[in-house]
């Protein structure tokens, strides 16, 4: 009997040890994946390219709306797949006569949808709505940022337990205005980034800091900021949904992809 009890005790100790090792491995893997998924900013290489003027030859989007024209420089070097998707859709005429379907009071507007309520059409091209989210430390949600809106989030079976997953973006885009950048918010930006340069940029330019490294920024408006402001101040319908649909139709008439020319810009300014 004593020998049986000893064997049973050894089995119990061995089982407990094995379970402890499994739990430890699980915790280490989870911790590793969690750390791996965090977005790290390298302050030594941080370049706030949106604060710079476009250079001759840079790709731009000329967005013609029913309220006026917006011009934005694009950043294929930082968000290549997003810019390619947007460019191909624009050049195909997809955005012609699409709706500004959301206006968040003073903060941002969302546009580029065939349906007024922002829903994708039944026959939408799934490949256009499954562009993996591209974040870059040089791109931030400053005022005038041109952003790609998130369409879906996918997780594998294992990721449901360990965390992680993949966000995808698509055809619809957002134009950011700004929230009130208070002293408290500036302190929060600095505490999270440890970057005076980034904090000062938000303070001077404005934007939506809460979107930082959450939304894909792929362009920056350099002409037509007054139109961006108007688009975020539209009168909207009263409804229980999350989409704040403008009462009056505001349209994206067309989007033309072009190259920036300082000479052309100077001539237009004179005219």
Give, region by region, the residue ranges found by the protein language model.
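Cyclophilin-like peptidyl-prolyl cis-trans isomerases
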Residues: 1-271
